Regions:
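Leucine-rich repeat
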Residues: 88, 110-113, 115-118, 131-135, 138, 153, 156
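N-terminal capping/linker segments that flank leucine-rich repeat
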Residues: 14-108, 117-122, 126, 131, ...
Length: 157
């Protein structure tokens, strides 16, 4: 009987330790990994509360993101538009691990820096890219992708 109690106690401590690890990773500040203009747009949308502190838990709920280089962002939680934030880099986008829909719209002359490896978006179901120079596109890890649209992107296949 003591052995069973000891085993259950150890299992519970392991679960508790794992929860602490998960919670601590959710509280990791990744603000320095984001493009400043992308941070400004996310702040204006009230997706983040502070541009100097972006916790993974702050952005984990975002499933639908639309970016324009002229720029406005919308998501399921808040459909407000931002004022002009000229985003030239997608640096930081890779931290949106819950994205199900992503739409990127440019003006045909745009070349975005830091094009992410889209295959890291495991939950992505819809990807639409319009008028952004995109020489290559890796979606090999997007097993849930059901809708892909790339228009006027100069994509090399």
């Amino acid at each position: 009987m003591k052995n069973i109690i000891l085993i259950v106690s150890l299992l519970l401590m392991g679960v508790s330790s794992r929860a602490d690890i998960l919670n601590s990773s959710d509280n990791k500040n990744v603000a320095d990994k984001f493009d400043p203009m992308l941070k400004a747009a996310l702040f204006q949308m009230k997706i983040i509360a502070d541009t100097s502190s972006i916790l993974l838990s702050d952005i984990d709920y975002v499933e639908d993101l639309e970016l324009k280089t002229s720029l406005w962002i919308n998501n399921d939680v808040n459909r407000a538009k931002t004022t002009r934030h000229e985003i030239t880099s997608l640096k930081g986008l890779e931290y949106f691990s819950s994205l199900r829909r992503l739409k990127l719209v440019g003006n045909r002359t745009d070349t975005l820096e830091c094009i992410p490896d889209f295959s890291r978006f495991k939950e992505l179901r819809e990807l639409e890219i319009i008028q952004i120079y995109l020489p290559k596109l890796d979606i090999s890890g997007c097993k849930n992708l059901t809708n892909l649209s790339c228009r006027s992107c100069d994509l090399n296949t």
